[in-house]
Amino acid sequence: MAATFQYPFQCIKSVERRNSGRQLIIGSAGPKIYTYAAETGERLGIWPETANTAEAKAAPSTTGEEPPEKRRKVSPPPDQKPEDSEPASQKSRKPEASPAWSTIPILAVSADGEYVVAVTAEDKCIRVFEVEENGALKQLSERQMPKRPSAIALADDDRTILCGDKFGDVYSLPLIDTGKGSVAPRAPAKVRPDQPAATTLTVHSKRNLASLEQQLRHYGQKDKNSAEEKPSSTFEHHLLLGHVSMLTDLICVSIPMDSSSEKKRSYILTADRDEHIRVSRGPSQAHIIENYCLGHTSFVNSLCIPQWAPEYLVSGGGDNYLLVWRWNEGRIVQKVPLVDETSDSEVAVRGIWVTDKMVLVAIDGSAKLLCFTLESDGTMKAQNSIQASGNVLDLTISSKDSAVLVSVDAVHVAGSTQEWRATPSSSSTLIEAFRLKSDTENVEWEPMSEAITSQVNSQGTSEISATLEEKQKKELNDALYSSGNLRKKNLGEDE
């Protein structure tokens, strides 16, 4: 049997359902989304649901390796035998229909824990799911955006999706699809004759006949293009703002309008590939630009505002440092180095997260999770880092015990975004848990043996063949580690 890896979790989220008090862990690995009980690690659901998933619901101990149940046939060939007449061993070897996407690079969760928003990459769809009582995901809508989404966030009302795309635009969409279109009516076209007034009876010279023939071909092609014109989007969405380059991250935040007022004003902070961070007002006034935070020299792809100190912003991207801002003033508070100043190695920040007055930073292709404390004056101090067993892909903070759950890449060699491990391990490590040591004065982390980690790691996700062709390996490399592609190439004078 060929050796196989397991798809690592590209995104992982901790979900606390306010209505029921139940805590879940949701992660996307390859083309699927998995949900788990946070306390026990029991797998509660897989989306999209397969025959194996349905069987697993009937028998919780099933790991998905047994023959699938009978499935509805879709357009079988005329000479294909009925499915019931085939041996079970042949049924189990039948490949399942592949979805139209290979990865789910973005997940977001509503504050009440009732809804999950996901982006499926290749089909450019934003999908909204309801988290059911049993922990499974029920898809409520799928909306194909004009351009591929590159960042999403939920607005302060928790019922509006903000979507940034690769062309720099930011749209707002209702969380629950209204079914109403929002495309502005087109201006009436100028009345023009459908065909030239001249005919072969009125044109006689060879040159004029050739010109007439060309005009007729032009009008015929125009009619064809009009007939083939794609229909407009039928779901409600509104353009809020735009950048002149690819939008890489966005967040929404509300702060008091002044020190003596309880009234708050919402803002949208957006980052792009051209080193810019833009501060705009909330969705209703997004056309108003408050200021820019300018100071990066490479792309910016990660923005983070601490909940306990919303006046500060931590940003990172292709520079070998982070910047701490007083974002409503556009003022840099501190420049925080990520590597030794003498190092010429390129750095790509993968993500920035906050927990317990601390800031955690992941670097693309690194198994080390950098840790900083955020002081009251907005400065950050480096602390002991977290060492994972593989490259850090994502993390989430458990609301139950503030444990840091880290998604680990068990496919690539630690420290590399291109080199695959020689052989898969007998049991893949998909997530690891860490917590702060309570009996030390300094900030120190220790690994935790949690039910959630052991259960998730033992159940695995989908399999990846260790003998994939180089082209397929490169596709997975690019899907997991895309930050480096944002870096602009320095072309020499002779190029």
UniProtKB/Swiss-Prot annotation:
- Name the domain of life: Eukaryota
| SUPFAM superfamilies linked to this entry | WD40 repeat-like (SSF50978)
Output the GO biological process annotations, alphabetical, semicolon-separated.
Answer: tRNA (guanine-N7)-methylation
What the entry lists under Gene3D superfamilies is as follows: YVTN repeat-like/Quinoprotein amine dehydrogenase
The pathway that the record names for this protein is:
tRNA modification; N(7)-methylguanine-tRNA biosynthesis
Against SMART domains, the record matches this protein to: WD40
Organism lineage: Eukaryota, Fungi, Dikarya, Ascomycota, Pezizomycotina
Where it mainly occurs, coarsely classed, is nucleus
Annotated WD repeats reside at 99-139, 245-290, 295-337
From the Swiss-Prot or TrEMBL record, state where the protein is found: Nucleus
Quaternary data: Forms a heterodimer with the catalytic subunit trm8.
Q: Which key words are in the record?
A: Nucleus, Repeat, tRNA processing, WD repeat
Region (Disordered) location:
51-100
* Pfam families registered for this protein in UniProt: WD40
**Function noted in UniProt:** Required for the formation of N(7)-methylguanine at position 46 (m7G46) in tRNA. In the complex, it is required to stabilize and induce conformational changes of the catalytic subunit.
* Family to which the UniProt record says this protein belongs: Belongs to the WD repeat TRM82 family.
Q: Offer a single GO CC term for the protein.
A: tRNA methyltransferase complex
Residues folding into a coiled coil are none
Protein name as annotated: tRNA (guanine-N(7)-)-methyltransferase non-catalytic subunit trm82
